[in-house]
A protein has these predicted regions:
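A C-terminal cap/extension of S-adenosyl-L-methionine-dependent methyltransferases
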Residues: 163, 197-266
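Class I SAM-dependent methyltransferase SAM/SAH-binding core
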Residues: 55, 61-108
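A short glycine-rich, Lys/Arg-flanked "PGG" loop and its adjoining helix->strand segment in the class I
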Residues: 132-144
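Conserved class I S-adenosyl-L-methionine
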Residues: 1-49, 63, 67, 149-171
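A conserved beta-strand element that flanks and buttresses the S-adenosyl-L-methionine
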Residues: 120
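Short alpha-helix
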Residues: 175-195
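Short catalytic micro-motifs in class I SAM-dependent methyltransferases
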Residues: 123-127
């Protein structure tokens, strides 16, 4: 069953990789756009990464590794999909940086203990059959004092769950968004843990895509669209983000966000 799940994930992402045009990827937007609050949260806590050895788990098209390489990190980009690793290497070449690329299973990493200064993962854990195993592996390969930085979707918001059901063609059958209580496990594993959640009122943008702009969720990935069109969306997003800040101060509201971002120190 586990191998079958991983193989389905590999096939899905290989097919996606075959359709990616690296020339259209604006790397910095995935970290610096106002509509990338998860990565902005992570960047604030990463510190100076120049010369640091960074493992990018589930590297996808390589936006993360390329961005960090541009900041001076030595990046190892890994993905279970060989197609995605190849795209990441192409993106690095197109941006004039060097990264190492490897196919890897995040639940069984082929790296020694205490290897990396930083482990980064975006939208990975909800594709993993057992996220806790992947978290243990992140912890294992980090040097003492190293940081695991990652973000993923949560399962609790009814609006985003409707979107997930509609966008079946651009999602895998085995995806399992996280329960916010996984934070308790992360806190038990790492010496320090900081986290926040993002996108509550700001999810109005998804509703606008569907109800007003008539964007087919099976033809355009909304979570890519918010980055690609960040300049157009910025005025609306920034107004709604202020409301998110108010909502998250209310009891239990953080769990109804779309995404959670975590920085955990070994």
């Amino acid at each position: 069953m586990l191998d079958e799940t991983l193989e389905r994930e590999r096939q899905f992402h290989n097919a996606w990789a075959a359709a990616i045009d690296v020339d259209g990827i604006r790397v910095a937007d995935y970290f610096e756009a106002c509509t990338a609050p998860e990565n902005r949260f992570i960047l604030k806590q990463m510190g100076d990464i120049r010369g640091k050895l960074l493992l990018d788990l589930g590297c996808g098209a390589g936006e993360n590794s390329v961005y960090f390489a541009k900041q001076g990190a030595r990046c190892v980009a890994t993905d279970y999909s060989p197609g995605m690793v190849e795209i990441a290497l192409q993106l690095a070449a197109a941006n004039g940086v060097e990264i190492e690329g490897r196919t890897a299973n995040a639940m069984a990493l082929d790296f020694p203990d205490n290897t990396f200064d930083l482990v980064y993962a975006s939208n990975l854990l909800h594709h993993i059959p057992d996220p806790k195993i992947a978290l243990k592996e992140m912890h294992r390969v980090l040097k003492p004092g190293g940081k695991a930085c990652f973000w993923d979707p949560l399962k609790h918001n009814p609006v985003i769950n409707v979107y997930r059901r509609m966008a079946s063609e651009v999602r895998t059958d085995d995806e399992m968004p996280l329960d916010i209580n996984i934070v308790n496990y992360i806190q038990s594993l790492f010496s320090e843990t900081s986290y926040d959640t993002f996108w509550i009122a700001t999810l109005w943008i998804f509703l606008r895509f569907y109800l007003i702009e008539k964007v087919d969720p099976n033809k355009e990935r909304y979570w890519k669209k918010i980055i690609i069109e960040q300049e157009r969306l910025a005025p609306m997003y920034l107004r709604l983000e202020k409301f998110d800040g108010i909502l998250k101060k209310m009891p239990l509201m953080k769990r109804f966000a779309w995404n959670i971002a975590v920085v955990a120190k070994k």
